[in-house]
């Protein structure tokens, strides 16, 4: 068809050009032009023809039987559509439309049609400007002139193009409109719309306009089923309209989840050639079915997952297996242990000085808990199994630990005092117990390893800051302690003007990568016991698994513990119920089911212990307050470990009466409750490491500690509230004399606080000095050794629940004991500590 049309088409175009015929003179003058070219511009000599085509791109020169000739034929059909001029080339025109076409074609011929005139630009003229490119046309150059545009208008041969399509005007045929030249197609479109379906000019009164184009009303139909789409919904695909049904059947995608069509009205998600319904049920994790809409996802083998755990087929909520639970916690513990060991030598001397000046009983907070261990703890609680004795928290065979000559003052405390210690308000060191009584108490306490769970809650045991024998000797677990566990013991602390080195170890710890918070002791704040039996309802487990999530969310790590503690209230402890899951194994092994422990104590709560310990000094030691110790570069009142006696001539690393003895550096052991020992007994600080597997074997030895109850019921005398009030008046008066500019540290704090808030008047005073002396929250979350009393990496907890005890009941229960001479505690701490304890309920039953 292409080979037949050129001659006919050329005749048609000649008629359109007002019966324009090639001039015979032009053909004769061109010489061999007709033989070489398919078409030559009329009126040119052969050399001018060659000059003209030399200006055009080679691929557009219409040589005979060349690509240029084919291009010319194609452009004739495209630029001069026959159906724009002849009715016979149109389809399905009614009579009115045929008349319209004739009128339209004749009007265009009369007013717009023309052919360009090619001739050399006269040499006598100075030159002209090309209408298209603006370039100069010099004399003698070949130029194209358009009579309809005017005599002075000319173009370079390659610039004689359609204004719309920028294509060379085939055979120089143009249509002039409003100062611009067009090809026949685009000129007709300037006057009438063209149907996108039949490519004919639309002469009807109505048409459909869609996608920026026009259609005859009957022609705008589905490309597949030819359903008229005028006023209907349609979908364009590759420039063709489709009805919704045909499009869904031909092009709709299938959902990879439900294998159903994704309708045109349904949203869809697409990734790497895959498609899903944009719904929570389809675009979700392939393992846990969690919706991934608006969330990142992990593609793997044609499926999408919400996490790496799901992509590996693991349980995203955690596994029952102790091997797979909290692997990240174990990794953090191993890194923490390596860091502590690496900085051991660097911080040993600095921590020695720090510990000799400040020995505050507090416990380390851990953010690492094995869920299975928590479950085993709760099982142990509910079954009221025998408690476990704690293994030594720190102990070094190479570095002995000795106590001073004040150990005999640490053994007796009244229940009021103990409860007040739980309230972090006051504490005191009663005297009156001889040094010889302490070894006997040790023998009674540890001669029989069997202690029941109730004994762990209400028996006699270590004092509030007492170091039990297990703390320093290997092979056994430490006894569990609750709020009532401390009734027979107490602590003492000496204050004096002792030249102790500055706290440079804090800076070394910061530089060495070990936070001071990594040195938090592990003994619980609530290490108190009662001797009376609890009712079954009072022995229900009180752990809380939701505190595990809370503790992990708070970021209590070795690096972040200090920041968290700085945010705590100055006069209140954090919600101790949140700590029940932090290190349940360590905590419950010391205090049964009581969740509040020193592990969750903030820096302010530690300071409140310090303020509490100030009550231990009597008037004889009060004059020492005038000689403050050095804390860093500040002159403040330092504090000595309760078991140490210093004099100015002895180095801070030595103990009185012990040659070559120095204190275990704080990088290897935590600040703990000090216990009274005889002067000649040597203890080795050491932080033991327990393996989780070895702990699990000792879940079977829960009934090994029962006989201590009878042996530990010999308690030192206790004091009553009247002595405490009297001492408080004397103490406050003497403090006002000795420290006139100091605010009252022992003023009673309001009771109208949260049952978990512990009033602390000491925090404001000691805040500037102990802000950087916070305790480690993460350094020993999972110690490793082969000692007993652990199951799957965590100690077996013991149940307990305390109840409110009236003053009469306390006097009745402890009437056999006298109140120590320096008792400074009243009944205020009792109800407050019970309220603290009462608010800790276990959410796992």
From Swiss-Prot:
It comes from the Eukaryota. Residues 128-193, 193-253, 253-317 form the LIM zinc-binding domain. The modification Phosphoserine is found at residues 92, 319, 321-322, 544, 547, 608, 643, 732. The modification Cysteine methyl ester is found at residue 842. This is Prickle-like protein 2. Residues 843-845 form a propeptide. PANTHER family: LIM DOMAIN-CONTAINING PROTEIN, PRICKLE-LIKE PROTEIN 2. Its main location: nucleus. Expressed in the hippocampus and cerebral cortex. Residues 314-346, 483-546, 558-581, 642-700, 823-845 are annotated as: Disordered. The modification Phosphothreonine is found at residues 535, 537, 540. Belongs to the prickle / espinas / testin family. Residues 18-126 form the PET domain. One of its GO terms (cellular component) is lateral plasma membrane. Keywords: LIM domain, Lipoprotein, Membrane, Metal-binding, Methylation, Nucleus, Phosphoprotein, Prenylation, Repeat, Zinc. GO terms for molecular function: zinc ion binding. Residues 683-693 have a biased composition (Basic residues). GO terms for biological process: blastocyst formation; embryonic brain development; establishment of cell polarity; establishment or maintenance of epithelial cell apical/basal polarity; maintenance of postsynaptic density structure; neuron projection development; regulation of postsynaptic density assembly; response to electrical stimulus. A lipid is attached at residue 842 (S-farnesyl cysteine). Pfam families: LIM, PET. Residues 318-327 have a biased composition (Polar residues). It is found in: Nucleus membrane.
């Amino acid at each position: 068809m292409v080979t037949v049309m050129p001659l006919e088409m050329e005749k048609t175009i000649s008629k359109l050009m007002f019966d324009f015929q090639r001039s015979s003179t032009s053909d004769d003058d061109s010489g061999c032009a007709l033989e070489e070219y398919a078409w030559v511009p009329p009126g040119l000599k052969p050399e001018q023809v060659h000059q003209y085509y030399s200006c055009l791109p080679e691929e557009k020169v219409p040589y005979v039987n060349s690509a240029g000739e084919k291009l010319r034929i194609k452009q004739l059909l495209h630029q001069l559509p026959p159906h724009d001029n002849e009715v016979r080339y149109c389809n399905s025109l009614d009579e009115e439309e045929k008349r319209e076409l004739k009128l339209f074609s004749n009007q265009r011929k009369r007013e717009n049609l023309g052919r360009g005139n090619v001739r050399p630009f006269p040499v006598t003229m100075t030159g002209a400007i090309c209408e298209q490119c603006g370039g100069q046309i010099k004399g003698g150059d070949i130029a194209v002139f358009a009579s309809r545009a005017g005599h002075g208008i000319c173009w370079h041969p390659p610039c004689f193009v359609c204004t719309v399509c920028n294509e060379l005007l085939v055979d120089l045929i143009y249509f002039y409109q409003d100062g611009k030249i067009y090809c026949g197609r685009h000129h007709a479109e300037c006057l009438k719309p063209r149907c996108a379906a039949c490519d004919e000019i639309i002469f009807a009164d109505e048409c459909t306009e869609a996608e920026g184009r026009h259609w005859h009303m009957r022609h705008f139909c589905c490309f597949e089923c030819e359903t008229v789409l005028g006023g209907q919904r349609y979908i364009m695909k590759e420039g063709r309209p489709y009805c919704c049904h045909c499009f869904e059947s031909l092009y709709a995608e299938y959902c990879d989840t439900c294998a159903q069509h994704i309708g045109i009205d349904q949203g869809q998600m697409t990734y790497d050639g895959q498609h899903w319904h944009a719904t929570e049920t389809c675009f979700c994790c392939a393992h846990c079915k969690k919706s991934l809409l608006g969330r990142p996802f992990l593609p793997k083998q044609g499926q999408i997952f919400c996490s790496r755990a799901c992509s590996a087929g693991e349980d995203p909520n955690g596994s029952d297996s102790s091997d797979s639970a909290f692997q990240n916690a174990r990794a953090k513990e191993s890194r923490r242990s390596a860091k502590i060991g690496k900085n051991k030598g660097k911080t040993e001397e600095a921590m020695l000085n720090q510990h000799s000046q400040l020995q505050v009983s507090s416990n380390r907070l851990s953010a690492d808990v094995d869920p299975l261990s928590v479950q085993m703890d709760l099982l142990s609680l509910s079954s009221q199994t025998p408690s476990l004795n704690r293994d030594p928290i720190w102990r070094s065979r190479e570095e002995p630990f000795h106590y001073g000559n004040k150990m005999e003052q640490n053994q007796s405390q009244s229940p009021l005092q103990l409860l007040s210690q739980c309230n972090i308000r006051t504490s005191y060191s009663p005297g009156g117990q001889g040094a010889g009584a302490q070894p006997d108490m040790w023998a009674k306490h540890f001669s029989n390893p069997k202690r029941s769970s109730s004994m762990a809650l209400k028996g006699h045991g270590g004092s509030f800051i007492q170091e039990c024998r297990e703390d320093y000797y290997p092979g056994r677990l430490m006894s569990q302690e609750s709020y009532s566990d401390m009734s027979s013991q107490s602590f003492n602390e000496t204050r004096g003007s002792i030249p102790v080195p500055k706290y440079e170890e804090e800076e070394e710890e910061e530089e060495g990568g070990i936070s001071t918070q990594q040195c938090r002791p592990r003994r619980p704040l609530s290490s108190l016991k009662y001797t009376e039996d609890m009712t079954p309802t009072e022995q229900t487990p009180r752990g809380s698994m939701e505190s595990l999530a809370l503790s992990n969310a708070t970021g209590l790590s070795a690096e972040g513990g200090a920041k968290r503690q700085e945010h705590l209230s100055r006069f209140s402890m954090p919600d101790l119920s949140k700590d029940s899951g932090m290190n349940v194994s360590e905590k419950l092994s010391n205090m049964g089911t009581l969740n509040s422990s020193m592990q969750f104590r903030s820096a302010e709560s530690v300071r409140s212990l310090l303020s509490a310990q100030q009550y231990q000094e009597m008037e004889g030691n009060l004059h020492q307050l005038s000689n403050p110790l050095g804390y860093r570069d500040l002159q403040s009142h330092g504090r000595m470990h309760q078991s140490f006696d210093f004099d100015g001539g002895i180095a801070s690393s030595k103990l009185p009466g012990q040659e070559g003895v120095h204190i275990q550096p704080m990088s290897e052991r935590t600040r703990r409750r000090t216990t009274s020992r005889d002067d000649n007994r040597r203890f080795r600080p050491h932080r033991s490491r327990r393996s989780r597997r070895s702990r699990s074997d000792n879940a079977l030895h829960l009934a090994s500690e029962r006989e201590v109850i009878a042996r530990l019921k010999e308690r030192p005398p206790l004091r009553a509230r009247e002595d405490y009030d009297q001492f408080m008046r004397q103490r406050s008066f003497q403090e006002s004399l000795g420290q006139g500019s100091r605010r009252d540290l022992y003023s009673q704090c309001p009771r109208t606080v949260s049952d978990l808030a512990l009033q602390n008047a000491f925090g404001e005073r000691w805040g500037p000095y102990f802000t950087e002396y916070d305790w480690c929250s993460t350094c020993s979350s999972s110690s490793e050794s082969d000692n007993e009393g652990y199951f799957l990496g965590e100690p077996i907890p013991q149940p307990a629940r305390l109840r409110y005890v009236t003053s009469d009941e306390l006097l009745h229960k402890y009437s056999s004991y006298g109140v120590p001479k320096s008792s400074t505690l009243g009944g205020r701490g009792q109800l407050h500590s019970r309220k603290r304890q009462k608010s800790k309920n276990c959410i796992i039953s």
